[in-house]
């Protein structure tokens, strides 16, 4: 008998995903994203100016910041003040890279989009949920900028979503909870476009190693899950959900 998922899901079943748009008042785009017990507040803001390496190029930029509330995990974690942990820096760079791929930066002018991902509650999958929810917030932010006349043309290039997948008892499991993440011998974070192109694949063997066949199995399961998330994004962004 294989691994029994704590929440009763099938091995290749996503957690229940919910995205509440326009969650805060002042951000151009804001989404409360939930996947099972994991909750991430994703907001998108806009400011004039770009990093120094882009000054004078006429090109814009998108960057991301990621933080966890102290009570997002048990036990309470200390806030990160003067120095960010390596994990935090890695995750916010991943979010930034993933969502930058969705935008034609040349259409922004010398302006910057800032994606903030704040974890309210963590039961694994926070970086994946931040990307999937962050995309929805990004769409709303760009729509607001178009309505305000700040942008003349939408810079959106494609949809982006992400999911985790892991190997437990030699079987692929989709969208891992914390208990499953700990139990997995191999775990991946996969980011893809709406057309099925890969943006980023992060994979690690926690114990031992894995072969090419295992890699392909995990990516196939991740691709299936991301396609479901792409469809959820489309439903959430439909005019009837305004």
From Swiss-Prot:
UniProt binding sites for phosphate: 87, 125-127
Disulfide feature: none
Pfam families: RNase_PH, RNase_PH_C
Reaction(s) catalysed by this chain's protein: tRNA(n+1) + phosphate = tRNA(n) + a ribonucleoside 5'-diphosphate
Enzyme class: transferase
EC number: 2.7.7.56
GO BP terms: rRNA catabolic process; rRNA processing; tRNA processing
An example Gene Ontology molecular-function term: tRNA nucleotidyltransferase activity
Matches recorded under InterPro entries: ExoRNase_PH_dom1, ExoRNase_PH_dom2, ExoRNase_PH_dom2_sf, PNPase/RNase_PH_dom_sf, Ribosomal_Su5_D2-typ_SF, RNase_PH, RNase_PH_bac-type, RNase_PH_CS
Subunit structure: Homohexameric ring arranged as a trimer of dimers.
Stated role: Phosphorolytic 3'-5' exoribonuclease that plays an important role in tRNA 3'-end maturation. Removes nucleotide residues following the 3'-CCA terminus of tRNAs; can also add nucleotides to the ends of RNA molecules by using nucleoside diphosphates as substrates, but this may not be physiologically important. Probably plays a role in initiation of 16S rRNA degradation (leading to ribosome degradation) during starvation.
Stored HAMAP family: RNase_PH
PANTHER family in UniProt: EXOSOME COMPLEX COMPONENT (PTHR11953), EXOSOME COMPLEX COMPONENT RRP41 (PTHR11953:SF0)
Family: Belongs to the RNase PH family.
Name used for this protein in its record: Ribonuclease PH
Natural source organism: Thermosynechococcus vestitus (strain NIES-2133 / IAM M-273 / BP-1)
Gene name in the database record: rph
């Amino acid at each position: 008998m294989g691994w029994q998922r704590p929440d009763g899901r099938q091995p290749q079943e996503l957690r229940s995903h919910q995205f509440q748009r326009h969650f805060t008042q002042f951000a151009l785009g804001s989404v409360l994203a939930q996947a099972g017990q994991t909750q991430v507040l994703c907001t998108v803001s806009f400011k004039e100016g770009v990093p120094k390496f882009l000054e004078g190029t006429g090109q814009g930029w998108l960057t991301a910041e990621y933080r966890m509330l102290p009570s997002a995990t048990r036990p309470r974690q200390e806030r990160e003040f003067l120095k960010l942990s390596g994990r935090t820096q890695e995750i916010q760079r991943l979010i930034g890279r993933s969502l930058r791929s969705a935008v034609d930066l040349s259409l922004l002018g010398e302006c910057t989009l800032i994606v903030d991902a704040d974890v309210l509650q963590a039961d694994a999958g926070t970086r994946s949920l931040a990307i999937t929810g962050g995309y929805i917030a990004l769409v709303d932010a760009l729509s607001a900028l178009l309505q305000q006349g700040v942008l003349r043309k939408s810079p959106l290039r494609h949809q982006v979503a992400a999911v985790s997948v892991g190997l437990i008892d030699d079987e692929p499991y989709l969208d891992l909870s914390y208990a499953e993440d700990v139990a997995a011998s191999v775990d991946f974070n996969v980011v893809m476009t709406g057309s099925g192109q890969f943006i980023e694949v992060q994979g690690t063997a926690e114990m031992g190693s894995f072969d090419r066949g295992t890699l392909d199995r995990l990516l196939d399961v991740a691709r299936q899950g991301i396609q479901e998330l792409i469809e959820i994004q489309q439903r959430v962004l439909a005019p009837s959900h305004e």
